[in-house]
């Protein structure tokens, strides 16, 4: 049997880390992953996939991940259940074994500041040039 998930998407919110009662770090995040096809309205639909990270992985994502960060996640699919008001509820999520942030700091800063990557209209006066 083989259980492997690999996905690339964007974080929907800033990941928040919490400590368990036994002092283990855990971070939960949601990754928006675009589907390969467009919906009936002509727009690309997305799936919102819950991800769980533990330990150093959780601490690292909480420190460096931001809303909108492009991320690659490797892990395995897990289902857990709990009882509430006599009803059994199931939660399916990815238990991450590794992740990689796929944007440089400058790309992230441009995205966060809504700056386009196209600088063709940029005009500098001669006295503004650093050389």
Swiss-Prot record:
Pfam families: SSB. It comes from the Bacteria. One of its GO terms (molecular function) is single-stranded DNA binding. A motif (Important for interaction with partner proteins) lies at residues 126-131. Residues 1-103 form the SSB domain. GO terms for cellular component: nucleoid. GO terms for biological process: DNA recombination; DNA repair; DNA replication. Keywords: DNA damage, DNA recombination, DNA repair, DNA replication, DNA-binding. InterPro entries: NA-bd_OB-fold (IPR012340), Primosome_PriB/ssb (IPR000424), ssDNA-bd (IPR011344). Plays an important role in DNA replication, recombination and repair. Binds to ssDNA and to an array of partner proteins to recruit them to their sites of action during DNA metabolism. Homotetramer. This is Single-stranded DNA-binding protein 2. It comes from Streptococcus agalactiae serotype III (strain NEM316). The lineage of its organism: Bacteria, Bacillati, Bacillota, Bacilli, Lactobacillales. The gene is ssb2.
């Amino acid at each position: 049997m083989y259980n492997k998930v690999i996905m690339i998407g964007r974080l929907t919110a800033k990941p928040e880390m919490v400590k368990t009662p036994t002092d283990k770090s855990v971070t939960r995040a949601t990754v928006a992953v675009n589907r390969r096809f467009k919906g009936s309205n002509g727009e690309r639909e997305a799936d919102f996939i819950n991800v769980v990270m533990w330990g150093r992985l959780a601490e690292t994502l909480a420190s460096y991940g931001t809303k909108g960060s492009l991320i690659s996640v490797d892990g395995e699919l897990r289902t857990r259940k709990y009882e509430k008001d006599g009803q059994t509820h199931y939660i399916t999520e990815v238990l991450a074994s590794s992740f990689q942030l796929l944007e440089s700091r400058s790309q992230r800063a441009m995205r966060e500041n809504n700056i386009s990557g196209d600088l063709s209209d940029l005009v500098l006066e001669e006295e503004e040039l650093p050389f």
